């Protein structure tokens, strides 16, 4: 066994202890140091796990969904390693590993459930191919980081492509659902979907749905402030100007979003959120309906629960 199999945990734990004394809490700094001195530590340690690695990523809901998946697996009697306090960058995962491994580099766990930032998921899968991958959504929350929303989807596609076992996708998010195209189903990779009952879709708008709402409200505001009925000007091809061309483009976008909704209907969801109530929810799983109490606050966390159940 290489010397760093013993030296890295010792050095990393020492740095972690010093960092906790200095800052009084969890820190990704020890992970950064270990990545420098032993780039193979992450892959070497996670390869010990008999049941492999579950990767969870997406714009929103990563932390809650990761905790739910880990909790479900623990309820089955499995020992689960996760990154609850570290950052969701690769160095955060390494820092969390340093807290769990023995001085000999042994990780006492059956499976890992890891939350990864969209950008760092790409770096992670270059080192460790996940056995399972759960991709939640792509939203415009972080355009300052990724520029275009499609860039975020491209980052997540790398995680889906690298997965060797099962990829779980959000049926309601067209950018996520399309990632089935990059999975290696010819090599036995399974694709599963979680989704919403049609009656609930208005309560869980996708990024495209929210943009549609903004566009509609903007058009209404323009119509009211300028005093022009935009629907009348759209009836005459002779009156088309630059502003009308933009409106026509938006009409095409809305038609595409309608097609996306129809496509979602056609995809078979392995887990469907059927109904929500006061701390209760109904899920459709493999054709059966299950109603359960839910302690989590927030309606979106019920949809995250559907994602966790599908994993």
Language-model segments: which ranges?
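Short, basic phosphate-binding NTP loop
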Residues: 1-57, 72-76, 90-101
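Short gly/ser/thr-rich secondary-structure transition/capping motifs
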Residues: 35-40, 95, 113-117, 150-151, ...
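Conserved glycine(s) of the Walker
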Residues: 61
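A conserved segment at the C-terminal end of the G1
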Residues: 64-82
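Short amphipathic alpha-helical face segments that pack within enzyme cores
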Residues: 68, 92-95, 306-310
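Active-site nucleophile and cofactor-binding loops and adjacent substrate-binding regions
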Residues: 82-89
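Flexible active-site lid/hinge loop adjacent to a nucleotide/diphosphate
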Residues: 104-212, 293-295
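Adenine nucleotide phosphate-binding catalytic loops in nucleotide-utilizing enzymes
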Residues: 188-311
